[in-house]
Amino acid sequence: MLPHLPSVPTADELHRVRGIVDAARWSDGKITAGTQSAQVKNNRQLPQDCRESREAREIVLAALDRSALFVTGALPHRIFPPLFNRYEGSANAFGNHVDNSVRTDPLTREHTRTDVSCTLFLSAPEDYDGGELVIEDTFGCQTVKLPAGDMILYPSSSVHRVEPVTRGARIASFFWVQS
């Protein structure tokens, strides 16, 4: 069973993050994809160094700091700075892939081994159709579509994908943890 963490940010924090990222300019999501995953990645992403990304990231990190479930579920030694993605329109899916085993922060050049992948849903499930996170693990395929503010943790070595979004926008924060 994959750890599901309910209500990671407060309602106010979630509202603030959505206000920040909704007003931002999004880029092609391939900016952070590895060579192989770039072939199946089709979404939008906030540039890591933009003001909006930095502001939203600080709110997410503060929420993680307060979450006992996150600490016990991920055992974080290092957290790769949270990123933000958006699936809608023609940039609406991410095919089967495995996350890179090591991520390098382009701003600090620090390396993070990716033991645990984290997806924090920022859109309510009724705001979009499709967009399910499908994770293949030893127990089969698990389909995840959580309320805004909820987060799922899963092994970074798992094959996973985001199903096409056919209506609305699926917005999330995603990041990796070195345990």
Residue ranges and their predicted role:
Residues 1-83:
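Non-heme Fe(II)/2-oxoglutarate
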Residues 69-179:
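Catalytic core of non-heme Fe(II) oxygenases with the double-stranded beta-helix
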